[in-house]
């Protein structure tokens, strides 16, 4: 299938690129040139850009059901998100954590920390594929996310990685950053997070009663520490704080109205709720099963 041009009843002009699966606004001049001879649009700067970036390539349809090299290259060239698991280490020992011995899925998970060299190799590769002619996601977000464990245990390494990302060219992709955190260390890094406009998701189940399953390794509650840190961030960066989101795990102790009221009165926000997953049969699976409560319709 070859690219084609068309105009609307309002005299707006477009080119459809089947190779990129995109509709691109064009000028009347390019529209007329394309109708006369598609090669004529190469004399125009924007037309040359479309050619050089694969928008004018003919699309070869394939129905064999197989993924080939070009499919992989195209997908990687337009990848929307990269997630760095900074570490499998965590400074909490939440009673329902999917990495504890109540679940069997991750029992053989090894503790580790991502090296800067590994992150750099990933970033370099992403930059190279974003600059490939198959990239049709110009001006689309490219999100670099940081996960754990607790990623802020290695906050300085996150800063090193982010600074390297900011030094790279991703071919006009809109680079953004996000992080999921338990907020026990967020106060130490809020300046950096705010400066780089991180999208932050905080795991917090509600007030001290609802948050009782989120404990330190010594089984001490985390609520006071987390609440104090969040208030520090809210007071230090009130506008940025408005972008922070909260996720609450729904358990047998959850009272939805009370949780929502806590977040509204404390932070002016509504949380999202996540259910516990049914564990596979294991020696300690009953602990999770006792905590499970179906989210109310």
Regions found by a protein language model. Give the residues of each.
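Conserved radical SAM core fold
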Residues: 103-104, 151-153, 183-187, 199-220, ...
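Hydrophobic faces of well-ordered beta-strands that scaffold small-molecule active sites
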Residues: 82, 142-144, 177-179, 200-202, ...
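A short acidic, amphipathic alpha-helical/loop segment
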Residues: 160, 188-192, 258-262
């Amino acid at each position: 299938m070859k690219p084609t041009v068309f105009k609307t009843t309002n005299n707006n002009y477009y080119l459809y690129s089947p190779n990129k699966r995109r509709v691109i606004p064009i000028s009347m001049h390019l529209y007329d040139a394309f109708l006369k001879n598609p090669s004529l649009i190469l004399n125009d700067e924007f037309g040359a850009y479309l050619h050089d970036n694969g928008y004018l390539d003919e699309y070869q349809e394939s129905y064999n059901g197989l993924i080939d090299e070009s499919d992989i290259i195209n997908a990687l060239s337009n990848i929307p998100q990269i997630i760095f698991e900074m570490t499998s280490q965590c400074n909490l020992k939440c009673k329902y954590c999917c990495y504890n011995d109540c679940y069997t899925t991750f029992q053989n998970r090894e503790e580790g920390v991502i090296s800067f060299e590994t992150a750099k190799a990933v970033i370099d590769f992403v930059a190279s594929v974003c600059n490939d002619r198959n990239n049709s996601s110009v001006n689309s977000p490219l999100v670099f996310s940081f996960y754990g464990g607790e990623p802020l245990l290695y906050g300085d390494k996150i800063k090193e990685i982010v600074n390297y990302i900011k030094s790279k060219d991703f071919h006009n992709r809109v680079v953004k950053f996000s992080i999921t955190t338990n907020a026990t260390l967020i106060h130490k890094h809020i300046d950096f997070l705010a400066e780089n406009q991180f999208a932050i998701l905080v795991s917090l189940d509600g007030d001290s009663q609802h948050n009782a399953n989120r404990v330190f390794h010594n089984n001490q509650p985390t609520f006071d520490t987390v609440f104090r840190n969040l208030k520090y961030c809210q007071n230090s960066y009130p506008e940025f704080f408005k972008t922070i989101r909260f996720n609450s795990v729904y358990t047998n102790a959850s009272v939805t109205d009370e949780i929502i009221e806590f977040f509204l009165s404390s932070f002016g926000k509504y949380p999202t709720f996540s259910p516990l997953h049914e564990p596979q049969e294991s020696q300690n699976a009953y602990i999770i099963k006792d905590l499970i409560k179906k989210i109310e319709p």
